[in-house]
């Protein structure tokens, strides 16, 4: 018996260095994957779900913090984590991460970090449907970035956010000017991932005018074709969601001219809703359900719309959303006070 125990102890001691080596080598591989996600502008893929992205980021960021506090990737990885929290429905954690980003960047007066922190604040406002404040935060982020360079390569990412916020506010002429700026930038600095999401914004702009003329919807179809072309070359699961979601919006708009398209839109929304129903707090599930409710409403399907509305907007959710807005307001107020000092 003692001999067996001794053998086990020897084996255990021998395994410790090997286990340490495995842990040490695994972290760089995970970090490389997260950095690859940054380049692709995705939050998950077919093999790495959103929960893994969050878990890896939470473990890796404290390790790389010491030597990377003034590194762009360090803050972009934090933004990626904040967006992953938001997508999963953990809004409070996303706000906490935005606060941490701002405090770290402010401590070292790192302007890129302050810019990205303001973007994270804007993203939190966006998910809380506070479009005015989201736009203000994105513009603050752009102002901070312009202190570094008005030609900074990250500028186009903020322009995409600003365009989206302007469209949500109904300021379509301003959004169109931003989209033109984005298009010019992409001609000089081609990037397939940014091009994919730029086509989403251009498609959304055309779809928002679809009730005026079918010509706008023809434009939207061209942008969807561009998205599909990129997706076929780079078949990311993250892109697939956005392609289907934007296509459903196109079908919904086409339904104003031919109601048969509403059935196509509902089919796509239902397909996406079933895929993401495992977490009904996720941003994707809520977006899809909101669009489905609207589509039921314009089709006169009041009961179906009401049932989904009750599921999505419970009293607890409303009170929680108000709490989120207060959290974000406090964080943005801190930035505004710092600007006055």
Can you name each region flagged by the protein language model?
Residues 31-35, 51, 263, 273, ...:
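Hydrophobic positions within repeat-based interaction scaffolds
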Residues 58-65, 99-106, 140-146, 180-190, ...:
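Amphipathic alpha-helical segments of tetratricopeptide repeats
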